[in-house]
Regions:
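Short strand-loop junctions, especially beta-strand C-caps/beta-turns
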Residues: 7, 85-89, 141
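Amphipathic beta-strand/beta-sheet edge segments enriched in Tyr/Trp
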Residues: 2-44, 176-186
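C-terminal/domain-edge helix-coil "capping" segments
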Residues: 30-120
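Short flexible/disordered coil segments
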Residues: 28, 32-41, 65-73, 137-155, ...
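Hydrophilic extracytoplasmic domains
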Residues: 99-186
Length: 186
């Protein structure tokens, strides 16, 4: 996403614009490139002309930052957030339940380590009922070449839990960069 904010300035007969140009990652909403500044005051008062004159000198810098971000995504994966929650349906399952000698939270952590790009993720919360993984780096595309988002990545984890441990879960993916798996509910 590209955002442009600007203000129109008038000093005597001369006009300029002060602008802020930002590129945002559509998955995370984080700013990945940006430039700002004020154009040289001129006698023209047409806002599109003033914006073009103000921004054109900074576009190479903006584009190089954007390209660096794309290069980082290609090498290190796209960043998403994955949340795990346990639905209390009376089954007694929680993230401290044991499976093959490991707590379910450890099973999930191990899966994350094996399936993220270069094992990159941060466990920012881990309790009996919730786990939150931030800065999760996932591949840009699936094996079939289609784009991968947080929901498709979370589906892989959901299928793993069902196949290997018989754990029912539901994938709730409200956005491209965020997915939530609810364990104990289908």
């Amino acid at each position: 996403l590209i955002e442009v904010d600007f203000s129109y300035n008038t000093v005597g007969p001369k006009h300029s614009v002060t602008y802020n140009l930002r590129a945002l990652d559509a998955y995370t909403g984080k700013q990945v490139a940006g430039v700002d500044g004020t154009g040289t005051p001129t006698f023209t008062s047409e806002i599109p002309v003033l914006l073009e004159e103000a921004v054109v000198g900074h576009m190479d810098n903006f584009i190089s930052r954007l390209q660096a971000y794309f290069d980082d995504c290609r090498e290190n994966g796209r960043e998403v957030v994955i949340e795990i929650g346990v639905f209390d349906n009376g089954s007694g399952i929680n993230l401290e339940s044991e499976y093959g000698g490991s707590e379910l939270s450890e099973v999930i952590e191990n899966w994350m380590a094996e399936n993220t790009v270069k094992h990159q993720y941060l466990t920012s919360e881990s309790t009996e009922s919730t786990m939150l993984f931030e800065n999760v780096r996932i591949p840009l595309v699936k094996e079939n070449g289609m784009p991968k988002d947080a929901g498709s990545f979370a589906n892989e984890l959901r299928k793993f839990l069902k196949t290997k441990y018989g754990i029912e879960s539901k994938n709730n993916s409200p956005s491209l960069g965020y997915a939530q798996i609810i364990i104990g509910e289908k």
